[in-house]
Amino acid sequence: MKVDLPESRLPSLYRDFRPLKDLNPDGYEANISTWRDFFLQQYISNSNRIIFTIGTRTLQELTHEVYGVPKSIDIAIDVLVNEGNLIPMELFNLGGMYTDNSRKGFWKWVRSWKESTNMYKSRKDETNFYLREDKFIIKANLEKEYQRFHELLKRSVFMEASSITDLVFTRNEFVTTESLQSFFSTYDEETKNVFLHFIENYKHIIVSKDNVIKVIAAEVEDITSRFSKGITENDLRIASVKVGIININKQITRLRKEINESNIKLRGPEFNELPKRIRIEYKQARLLSEKHLSRLLKFQNNLAQVRTQIDTSATNAVLIQTLSESNEVIKSINGYIGSTEKVEDLLDEIKEGHDRTEEVNDLLAHYNKGQDEEAEEEIERELEQLELDEKNNNKEENKNQDLHEPKESSSEDLLKRLNNLKINTNEGPVQDNENHDNEIRKIMMEEQPR
């Protein structure tokens, strides 16, 4: 295969660079980092694969036409393992995928399944093909695929399940069911087993036994809470009934296809050219297929009825349990309430307390009424006094106004009298002028303030 590595560094990357750890630590770390990034890009991050396999085939794939087999890629693989990017398959199966690598107990546990004195080592010897034949779980990819799987499961099983029969499957039915088939179809058998192990032992979505799977996720707890979390004999029987229905459906589909093809042939122009004996055989074969189809349809209906009865029984069991629990709640509440005599006494006490409260209210109302009357009388007296004061003020104002009015009227009279006076432009007797002047002086004297 074509190796995408820096051309200028190929000699250093392909040789045994382990001695550089002491001689040239920077070069040693650079080589490890380059191979690590190469594996991440080429095998791990750039795909949806869940299992990563190492061994002789890996070395052969990376063999360079000039530099040969890479002599030290085991170090980069060990780094990926120790970082937690790759999980050894045996450790995964033992349940150690999420164990903290930094804890002392982790590698003590690892040593229990690997004869290692320190950390995981992918090198087995010093030969040309020095890598162990090992398999790893690509942790990030497995978790990413789980998110995709969970969304599919949520939109199908979680939302559509209404009875325990909707949560019990054979293994084959589970991985081939319509909503999940697109997910599992991209995996080989080994990868399917790994994923099923993951969702059972790490995510606790399912339980399995004897090729039967039961969904027990928290999202369907309203159904599973009434039944055992493990696989029971009833679960095995339910799975058997569902397998029977699936197999009959497959046979019905096949027979319908055969009958349709036979009908097309019987109606074709070439059919009439066949010998009579052969035409009879064709028609008999079609009749046999139709009879067999009729029997299968009856079997299908019978099994469907059995499944319906199972669902009904399961619902009845849930209903009975619910009624039983409801009865216990009612009994408990009634026990807390006590006897009917106790309730009657309580009601009598409440009535007596109510009557006493009414009496107190009446007394308080009468007392408040007396106080209100006194307050109203006081207000009335104050209002009368205010009205009296207002009348006196009005009289005083009118009196003052009268004092000013004569002066005003006298002024008006003066103006009128002056207007009535006529000045004679003709020369007349002096006596008349004197009389006129005297009249003016008289008027002015009258207007002098008294």
Swiss-Prot record:
GO MF term set: phosphatidic acid binding
Basic and acidic residues: compositionally biased ranges: 387-416
UniProt cross-references to InterPro entries, sorted A to Z: Snf7_fam (IPR005024)
Pfam families: Snf7
Stretches the record annotates as Disordered: 387-439
Gene Ontology annotations of biological process type: late endosome to vacuole transport via multivesicular body sorting pathway; nuclear pore complex assembly; vesicle budding from membrane
One CC-aspect GO term: multivesicular body
Additional observations: Present with 2530 molecules/cell in log phase SD medium.
Listed name of the protein: Uncharacterized protein YJL049W
Lineage: Eukaryota, Fungi, Dikarya, Ascomycota, Saccharomycotina
